[in-house]
Amino acid sequence: MFRKMRRAEKKAIPNEEAIRLLQESKRGVLAVTGDDDYPYAVPVNYYYDAAAGKIYFHSSLAGHKVDAMKRNPKICFTVYGEPEIKDLDWAPYVKSAVVFGKAQPVADPEKKRVVLKTFAMKYYPNEAEADEEIELD
């Protein structure tokens, strides 16, 4: 279904490291099929639910990204770590996790509230600020 990484034995990181990147990174790049089938990639905040194996994005209900996902739910999402330069090498090494999937909105209001609260706790320093932001949403 998906191409194998070229030279994967030298470049691929273990799944555990990819999951750690998804759990620890604050932002990633979401790529969708945009207008006239041009790729459209945009930095986004997200929350990774490791137990469910799902990635949640927060978004407005309208706009280029949302319209694109409604037309074609296939997406690609990438997160990456800090560059590291190894001894005697000129190029930085960057660990990344690339995830393919299909986007769908969270329809159930209670599920949406729970996901939004967990999402907010990732970005806000305390629960009161997270609750305040959710109320504004």
Predicted features and spans:
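A short, polar/proline- and glycine-enriched secondary-structure boundary/capping micro-motif
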Residues: 65-71, 88-89
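Short beta-strand segments
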Residues: 25-61, 69, 77
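Extreme N-terminal tail/first-helix region
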Residues: 1-23
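Generic structural signal for secondary-structure transition and capping sites
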Residues: 26-27, 74, 124, 128
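Active-site-adjacent structural patch at catalytic or cofactor/ligand-binding sites
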Residues: 59-61, 71-84, 93-104
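Short, solvent-exposed aromatic-acidic interface loops
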Residues: 59-64, 120
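A generic structural signal for nonpolar/aromatic side chains embedded in well-ordered alpha-helices
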Residues: 22, 68-69, 119
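Charged, gly/pro-rich active-site loop segments
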Residues: 2-9, 85-137
